[in-house]
């Protein structure tokens, strides 16, 4: 990362709100924290659900926000505002590729299958040394406990090495995630 350029933080999360107000609170806190730190934000481009909340919060705080959305999702996921910078891709894979290329770190908030797909994409690429960018999973109200358990089970069953657990940080909430992110961005690259 160019030391003169402010970090771009990619946020993966649901295009729905989920069933607990704590999910929305965490999304808004992450967006506000990104803006307060002076970082920019990259996200999936839609204005619905947690994705919209985190982007609107970051934008309201003055952060530059870059949306990336596949053409076929534009009708389902309207932009957060007319001012939103939006890159339209032909497919989901191009969206994920651009998110990786344009970002210096990743925050994962609660979401559905798309969020898990995005998490595993960047985690596998970190495992294969495609990148050494920090990945912070925000475990709001234990949402990602089962993910962490599954990855431990994968190691116990002999399908992964313990180094898999070093691919991501598990944060208890938005404040902890932002603190971890600040430290990770200022630390030497993980190998």
Regions found by a protein language model. Give the residues of each.
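Flexible, glycine/proline-enriched loop segments at strand-loop-helix junctions
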Residues: 109-110, 134-138, 165-168
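Active-site/ligand-binding-proximal alpha/beta "capping" segment
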Residues: 94-129, 136, 187-191
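Arginine/glycine-rich "motif VI" loop of SF2 helicases in the C-terminal RecA-like domain
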Residues: 59, 125-133, 159-160
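A cross-family phosphate/adenosyl-ligand binding-site feature
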Residues: 2-102, 140-191
